[in-house]
């Protein structure tokens, strides 16, 4: 059997390097990918620090990682769209093909979803494998080939970019819209970038940290920024050049941001809740009703969101990074070898200035 070095979360505060047998092709449409780049997600840190996110509770060891890209090293006999040597972005959640959610086009809501590095609560069943390993097996249709001018590093950003794609699609972001994005972490910055590529006339990013707001401007994701410590909805609209946002993408889950978003949004606007809260939050339901707003919950990503995300990178970088409208690569602030992966997790957990941290796959 081929060895498969992996990074494993055993329990809270306990990460170790382990070696398992590599997965093998078992279905005609299976593809074996050698993982090359993996990003650290906030959910990884929640499991590392707290052992749970909502109803997902860590009860047994779990291979970490779900933001990954790699190179195809083996394909099943029925695979037609990929070949050995292709670079791919890995979509890490596999639904049941028989679920009503899958059949209705909402496979991200499938109750039987096997999502990489997310605990399986079923007794006696292993956790779905994460992608922070050397080899990862996936169905062909949950891999998206990367164009030649889209790097493997960008491939690892496809997963969080797809979260932004899903949010903008739910909010029907289109030409002429004025979009307010709350939160300038990786998801918020990428959501802002997506809104801009979808044709929004203005995108204002809201946060309480000036260095994060500067990043939003520096990478080209925001036309305007606003530090919410400096005022409320009137000040936000003033900072937006007098434009009232008709779409809000709320990426923090923080109660003050939700309230400010509802206060600032135009009557009849579209409010997309992307961020999760640690616990219950109060919601300004009266203002929401009187403005006749439409609320969307946004969870991960769905059909064609990955392809859309890869398409955004394809178009953005078709003339090289120096001519790219949005400098997504600037979001990658830290890079680590696989042998130093635990150090990378500790850095991100400590909140020491990392925007997006990437880890190389095992050699």
From Swiss-Prot:
It is an enzyme of class 1 (oxidoreductase). Keywords: Carbohydrate metabolism, Metal-binding, NAD, Oxidoreductase, Xylose metabolism, Zinc. Belongs to the zinc-containing alcohol dehydrogenase family. Its cofactor is Zn(2+). InterPro entries: ADH-like_C, ADH-like_N, ADH_Zn_CS, GroES-like_sf, NAD(P)-bd_dom_sf, PKS_ER, SDH-like. This is D-xylulose reductase. NAD(+) binds at residues 183-188. GO terms for molecular function: D-xylulose reductase activity; L-iditol 2-dehydrogenase (NAD+) activity; zinc ion binding. The gene is XYL2. GO terms for biological process: D-xylose metabolic process; L-arabinose catabolic process to xylulose 5-phosphate; sorbitol catabolic process. Induction: By xylose. Repressed by glucose. Binds 1 zinc ion per subunit. Pfam families: ADH_N (PF08240), ADH_zinc_N (PF00107). The keyword Transcription does not apply. It catalyses: xylitol + NAD(+) = D-xylulose + NADH + H(+). It comes from Scheffersomyces stipitis (strain ATCC 58785 / CBS 6054 / NBRC 10063 / NRRL Y-11545) (Yeast).
